[in-house]
Amino acid sequence: MERKDLTKLQAFALEEMLEGKNVFLTGGAGTGKSEVIKMFIADREKAGKNILITAPTGTAADILGGETIHRAFGAPVGVIANSKPVKKREEVLQATDIIVIDEISMCRFDLFEFIAKMIEFENGERARERMQEEIGIHLEEPAKPEIQMIVLGDFYQLPPVLTKEDKATLEEIYHYDFGEGFAFRSVYWDMFDFEPINLTEIVRQDNAAFKKVLSYIRLAKEKEMCTSFLQSHSSTFPFSTEDAIFLSGLNNKVSELNEKKLSELPGKTKTFHADQDGDIKMSEKFAEDVLHLKEGCKVMFTINALSGEFKNGTMGTVMRMQDNCILIRTADGNIVELHRYKKEITKPTVKETVKNIKEMDAEGNIQVKKRL
């Protein structure tokens, strides 16, 4: 996508971010949030800015080529207490110009506060350095402006994980109403003075009536009209579910159905195991550790191929399998020879001689990246 292809709201969001404003970019699925942020990142990187790209999970971080929030900021897993003050600057943040957090709805408020306190301390040190410059004190390096914060996601879609046990513990620690645990419930949310920009035009779907219904469903509005619309598009004739796609909001239900369908296919099951080294957290994994396949089973790719042979969401059928190679026929008839995909889980570090964010290999994770 090029700038000329952006909608008015998308173009406005891009310009506001390029002007250096802190932005909360939101909108329903298919409104182009990721496309806009990719343009912004490309532009700022070309301008020599250091961008720390993060997301709550490995899968979300992988989309923008970033790392998980926990790894980027060294955040602990689980409930985070709010009592520990920040006493020193983090080297990575000293080199950072812009922080991008994708899927902000999945970032729980206590994790957001952990991040915000680190940024607040860093920005305070930068303000002190700018003041020193103004009164003529020589600094080894020019003082920097505050870190620009860009957060994007949809609070109507994916909530943060908040178990009963965690909620009970958090209520003892945080003495304010954090509701469902969303990041905007944090007392630090307003510190960034985000400009909220809501993308409203669905660009991934051309059917105007369907787009309208999708928007209503997202906002839980016009329930009777939406129900009537969906029912009018359901079949009144007997039909086979043999090749139908089943949707579920629960991973265990999906796994049960996949196992059932796989067992119904003839032939032997071939099992692929992920090869991994180092300390990799569960939230940083972007695919299952074990994958069971048979010839004839249907799969869906969950990454984009650099070659363009397939993209996230491409459907296909397994034709043949070897230990390190799988032959897949995509839905449009193309044959893809799939080999093991290597994903390096990295953490940001800074070299003393060059104040640039560098990526240091932390752990390797080699997986066959597709899903039944």
Indicate residue ranges for each PLM-predicted region.
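Conserved ATP-binding/catalytic motifs of P-loop helicase motor domains
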Residues: M1-L372
